[in-house]
A protein has these predicted regions:
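C-terminal outer-membrane beta-barrel translocator/porin domains of Gram-negative envelope proteins
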Residues: 410-412, 532-537, 541-650
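Acidic/histidine-enriched alpha-helical segments
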Residues: 240, 309-324, 509, 550-553, ...
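C-terminal hydrophobic structural anchor segments
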Residues: 646-678
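Bacterial Sec-dependent N-terminal signal peptides
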Residues: 1-25
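Gram-negative/organellar outer-membrane beta-barrel architecture
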Residues: 364, 369, 383-543, 614-623, ...
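Patatin-like phospholipase
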Residues: 19-66, 74-371, 375-387, 393, ...
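Short glycine-rich beta-strand segments
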Residues: 469-473, 510-514, 556-562, 597-601, ...
Length: 717
């Protein structure tokens, strides 16, 4: 019986350690190295392995990594524990990192108004320029700079709490590049620049891509460093069969894996303990399975506990000294310098960042300022470092400017007011002035329309703009029949001062042409107006389609045909569109939408306030109101309040309950303006798709009238 027990124990031991080098002998006081392979999201398995090593107190003397292995390995070498890295992984939205979408709250005021395109195609030298990747990696810079701030002053990676190296591939020569010195964030960016997903990274005079192209499993490099025992985490799953190759990423992965499979076999000769987690059904982009992947690494590492227990132990509990987060990493920035800028000067760059010199900054505050600069869309990528120069702290910015000036842009949209529309746009940057932009939209579909916008952005110094638009639309009665058809053309010239890209104040003059037709009697009417106006605008909403926080304000005072009327005849209007978004919980947001419009001596039907319809375009004095047809009711004055309770689930899905109340009235002479004459309830199901919003709404007036079913697809234009 005893012999049988020994036999089965030995058999289990052999089965468990088939990934352990044959005849492995552990010398006295061995040096232990950790080799972490690349594999995108599969690299989260490394974290599970690190947690096991930490729980046993294993002393690691050197770390090498490629791609995601470089990211995890770099964090570990910098003093983070396995649990620390697990927390980082679980709290990071990797899809958001890859999307590299601008933070809308920081986007320039002009760009917020033209945020409506699905496809953007740069034109250079008369030719279409295809993007080199999905993302430039700008958000990766923010994240890595923040994570590695405690070792940002260490240029020699052998001086880190655990010596470290990472592998990248020189894009021009195809040769392996081993990074052991320099900016650790930049080196890791180069090692993880997966082709087609992220732009190549320029360091010095060379450009680099993912190290997996040459050595994905850098075990041999550790042996060359004198490491006795190399513990490796192998993420290679071999080549896929045709039934598993279903996307561009799958095809690219398969091609890259041709070389990885061969090189990994070579690296196994230098790996003493090869930990190979079970990653069946998981791939480089399985970021939503990070918990499962992390657990697979932890489970696999537990099989090697008996061997790990024979290895040297740490004589300390932590590698990083705990730091008070309130006072940590605060730098006095005395000056700034910019490298590689040929189009935009230092003053423009510092101004857009709103950087005051000298001032105290953290890596987090610098990241936020760079986000403002990046949101101008004038730069492909912006890197930075804090350096010492003449006993001063200097913020060194290295920029890669977007030299493209011409763009073609396209969009699609459907709503119940303007029906279907295909948007084609031409955008020209730096026309006459470096800080200028011209945008020309043509909408082709059921209701053709055009928009022209030219603006010189001088920040808080007033800039000049020209705007023009033209459109046609039908007004409907409560029986859903069109009773009027309008053509409206507007041309504006204005000056505008912008503060922090959140507020704009200015004034101008507009020229309106109206052509209206009564579809019942056939009567036609045409009027023209020259109107001076002033305005105050604000926009800090985090999303145009499904905002969760921030506000929107548009307050305008306009005098109609001011230059043609006597003082007694002059007509004025004051209107305010005010919206606020207030997060109640992580998933629930209260959204307030209010509109106030007042008329003095108004005599034109074209400038009355019209209530009804679901739309978000700027259409004269038409006001959105659920449960009523577009332009169903009108009068000289209006008060409306919309209350939305927006519930967000499964990241991009929404359910919105709405209660709207309002009033239209002729004057303020009696108490009628305090009455609620219009009210409705509505329910919306929405999806924030890569192609814009998808909304299905059912709204019902609280009066005795039929409900209205509406569909909205795509960005508003």
């Amino acid at each position: 019986m005893k012999k049988i027990f020994v036999f089965f124990s030995l058999l289990i031991f052999i089965l468990n350690y088939t990934q352990v080098k044959e005849n492995l002998a552990i010398p006295k006081n061995p040096k232990i190295g950790l080799s972490l392979a690349g594999g995108g999201a599969k690299g989260f398995a490394h974290v599970g392995v690190l947690k096991v090593l930490d729980s046993l107190g294993i002393k690691v003397d050197y770390v090498s990594g490629t791609s995601m292995g470089a990211i995890v390995g770099g964090l570990y070498a910098s003093g983070y524990t396995g649990k620390d890295i697990e927390k980082i992984v679980m709290e990071t939205d990797f899809y958001n990192l890859l999307s590299n979408a601008n933070n809308r709250a920081e986007t320039s005021f002009f760009n917020k108004s033209v945020d409506k395109y699905l496809l953007k195609v740069p034109i250079k030298n008369g030719k279409v320029t295809l993007p080199s990747s999905i993302t430039s990696g700008q958000k990766n810079i923010y994240l890595l700079k923040e994570l590695f701030k405690n070792v940002s002053n260490i240029q020699d990676f052998s001086k880190l709490p655990i010596p470290f190296l990472c592998v990248a591939t020189n894009l021009e020569s195809g040769k392996m590049k081993v990074f052991e010195k320099g900016d650790i964030s930049e080196s890791i960016m180069a090692s993880s620049a997966f082709p087609s997903l992220m732009d190549p990274v320029k360091i010095g005079d060379s450009i680099y891509v993912d190290g997996a192209m040459t050595v994905n499993y850098p075990s041999e490099l550790l042996k060359k460093k004198g490491i006795d025992i190399v513990i490796g985490v192998d993420l290679n799953q071999g080549l896929n069969t045709r039934d598993k190759i279903n996307s561009i990423v799958d095809i690219l992965n398969q091609v890259i894996d041709f070389g990885i499979v061969k090189e990994t076999k070579n690296q196994l000769k230098y790996t003493d303990v090869n930990i190979k987690p079970n990653l069946d059904g998981l791939g480089v982009t399985s970021f939503d399975e990070k918990g499962k992947i992390l657990k697979s690494g932890y489970t696999e590492a537990l099989k090697y506990v008996e061997i790990f227990e024979q290895l040297p132990k740490k004589n300390y509990d932590y590698l990083r000294i705990p730091i008070n987060p309130i006072y940590s990493n605060i730098y006095k920035i005395d000056d700034a310098e910019v490298e590689n800028n040929n189009i935009y000067n230092k003053d423009y760059i510092i101004g857009k960042m709103n950087l005051k010199l000298p001032s105290s900054q953290t890596y987090g505050s610098i990241n936020k300022m760079l986000d403002k600069l990046y949101a101008t869309n004038n730069f492909k990528i912006i890197n930075y470092d804090i350096i010492q120069k003449d006993n001063k702290n200097v913020l060194k910015l290295t920029v890669n400017e977007d030299s493209n000036r011409f763009f073609l842009k396209f969009g699609l949209h459907y709503d119940e007011v303007f029906k279907s529309g295909l948007l084609a746009n031409v955008t020209i940057k730096r026309l006459f002035f470096n800080n200028s932009s011209i945008s020309i939209d043509g909408v082709f579909g059921d209701k053709p329309r055009y928009y022209f916008n030219y603006f010189i952005d001088n920040g808080y110094i007033p800039g000049i703009g020209i705007y023009a638009s033209g459109m046609s639309f039908d007004l409907k009665n409560q029986d859903k029949f069109a009773y009027q058809s309008w053509n409206w053309y507007r041309t504006e010239a204005f000056i505008q001062s912008i503060w922090k890209d959140k507020f704009a104040i200015g004034g101008g003059i507009s020229y309106d042409i109206f052509n209206g037709t009564d579809l019942i009697t056939g009567f036609k009417k045409s009027e023209r107006f020259l109107n001076p106006y002033v305005f105050l605008k604000g926009d800090t909403q985090d999303s145009k389609m499904f905002p969760k926080r921030g506000y929107y304000t548009n307050i305008e005072t306009k005098a109609y045909n001011f230059f043609e009327k006597t003082s007694e005849e002059k007509s004025f209007q004051i209107k305010a569109d005010i919206r606020g978004n207030f997060p109640i919980t992580k998933f629930l947001t209260y959204r307030l939408r209010s509109f106030y419009g007042i008329s003095i001596n108004n005599s034109s039907d074209f400038y009355k306030y019209y209530l009804g319809g679901i739309f978000d375009q700027n259409v004269v004095n038409f006001v959105r109101f659920n449960g009523f047809e577009f332009g169903e009711a009108s009068n000289n004055n209006i008060l409306t309040v919309g209350n939305d309770f927006q519930f967000n689930f499964m990241k991009n899905y929404y359910v919105i309950a709405n209660l709207s109340i309002g009033n239209l009235f002729d004057n303020f002479d009696d108490s009628k303006f305090l009455r609620i004459n219009y009210s409705s309830l509505g329910l919306t199901a929405g999806y924030d798709s890569p192609f814009g919003q998808i909304k299905i709404n059912y709204s019902h007036s609280l009066k005795q009238k039929p409900g209205i079913f509406s569909v909205v697809l795509g960005h508003w234009f």
